[in-house]
Amino acid sequence: MKLSLLAAAAIAPMVSAHYFFDTLVIDGQETTPNQYVRSNTRPEKYNPTKWVNTRDDMTPDMPDFRCNKGSFTFAGQTDTAEVKAGSKLAMKLGVGATMQHPGPGLVYMSKAPGAANQYEGDGDWFKIHEEGICDTSKDIKTDAWCTWDKDRIEFTIPADLPDGEYLIRSEHIGVHGAHDGQAEFYYECAQVKVTGGGNGNPQDTIKFPGGYQKDDPSFNFSVWGGMKDYPMPGPAVYTGGSGSSTGSYNESNAEDSNEYPYQKESGTCQSNFYRREHARDFSHRRA
């Protein structure tokens, strides 16, 4: 569903505070808003999903946490974009918004058993991209984060991903209130058909809902009190040999480490997280 100019104008004052993804970018070319990205039925489309002080009675423990409230009702009228394995994509925010909350950006994919426009996203999800803190010399409350003031999350489709139709779930998590249990989730799903892929087999997966828990360290993080490491949520990034490099880490180190992921290099948004804390079972599946 496309927003009218009047509705967009009404939303514009809120864009720095709340936002939503509505545009798929394919190899640098922007598509039409909601052409390939499912819309939602929230009264204010930019409202976040939270566990505390909820909006629209939505929490991360509900099935609509997959692609946002009521999004499956738009699946049939949303086109499916054909994209090549290994291609560079982005999910862009609507109405000129930028991400002006501190927090990470993540991208997940889930293979549909058939057509993407008939898939509710109740299968397994694997992560293909993550980005957190880019520059430890900057303010953790604002511009230390890779996503700060950007209008999109950029990522690469793993080159060995099997052909077929998928949902792509882009997500930004605002952690400015996470110290009080009020992490904010902004997310939507695009429908794509991957071609020219390979025989990759992502094993490290989660489900939505269930993959995120209210007591996860990722969602109870404090940006107050100075710079600190951020514990990325979810499973390891599946790169398939040439997926998004931002957010990858060495899993052999992670399994034996009690440390949070940390930034290998500062001053760049190519953030290579190669340690993570396993504070609990993240409800993701390993082979």
From Swiss-Prot:
The coenzyme or cofactor needed here is:
Cu(2+)
A cellular-component GO term for this protein: extracellular region
The taxonomic lineage of its organism, from the top, reads: Eukaryota, Fungi, Dikarya, Ascomycota, Pezizomycotina
Under Pfam families, the record lists: AA9
Bias (Basic and acidic residues) ranges: 274-287
State the Gene Ontology terms under molecular function. Answer: metal ion binding; monooxygenase activity
Name by which UniProt lists this protein: AA9 family lytic polysaccharide monooxygenase D
Alphabetically ordered keywords of this record: Carbohydrate metabolism, Cellulose degradation, Copper, Disulfide bond, Glycoprotein, Metal-binding, Monooxygenase, Oxidoreductase, Polysaccharide degradation, Secreted, Signal
Ligand binding (O2): 176
Per the UniProt record, the source organism is Emericella nidulans (strain FGSC A4 / ATCC 38163 / CBS 112.46 / NRRL 194 / M139) (Aspergillus nidulans)
